[in-house]
Amino acid sequence: MKKFLSVFLLLTFTLLFSQEKKPMFWQDIQNFKKLNQENTPPKDAILLVGSSSFTKWTDVSDYFPNKTIINRGFGGSRLTDLNYFSEELLNPYQPKQIIIYCGENDFADNPKLKPKEVVNRYKVFYKKIREKFPNIQVDYISMKYSPSRENLWSQMRNANKKIKAFMDKEPNAEFIDITKAMEDTNGNVRKDLFLEDMLHITPEGYQVWTKIMEPYIK
């Protein structure tokens, strides 16, 4: 009877464990693993990590034709997600440069979030990068002013300033500010650079990003 009960409990536990809910973005990470299995990631590439502004930049290599780029952006991700999946996002690669775009969704997920908390989340991810890649170039692209998230801009701008101050003190690190480049002559954000959702940018928007990013690309 005891043996039967033990087997029953073991089977029950196994079933419950197998049905355990996967963490958010688990499938995205599995997709990255599959890509890496199908094609070994090249060494000394530029690794893009972050949220949908990278995910939707599917033709990023066309904007930087002489560079080898690995795009590992996954839409909706927050800095907390980059930290959670840091091993999967960093360990398979041997890049010469990492460029990060993330943080917007942290505020969108929790509008009451303080800029300092987002900055701390970024510092955690930066530290994880440096533990594995102490000497490579690491760059952070500023959170953009998205018309659909106008109510969050004050917090994002504050976080941008703090992240810039942090990056300015770090070796082999740069803060890439795309804010002014996306404004018109009156200092207003160019809505024509955005898709209908007023959140994601158009190919022309990516052209603007490219011009700002080019001096930083290794």
What residue spans do the PLM features occupy?
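Sec-dependent signal peptide cleavage junction
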Residues: F17-F32, Q37-K43
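Catalytic nucleophile-elbow at a beta strand-turn-alpha helix junction centered on a G-D-S/GDSL motif
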Residues: D44-D59, S77
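Catalytic His-Asp segment of secreted/periplasmic serine-dependent ester chemistry enzymes
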Residues: K144-K218
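Generic structural signal for well-ordered alpha-helices
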Residues: S86, Y122-K127, N160, K164
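Bacterial Sec-dependent N-terminal signal peptides
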Residues: M1-E20
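Charged helix-capping and loop-helix junction motifs
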Residues: P115-K123, Q155-N160
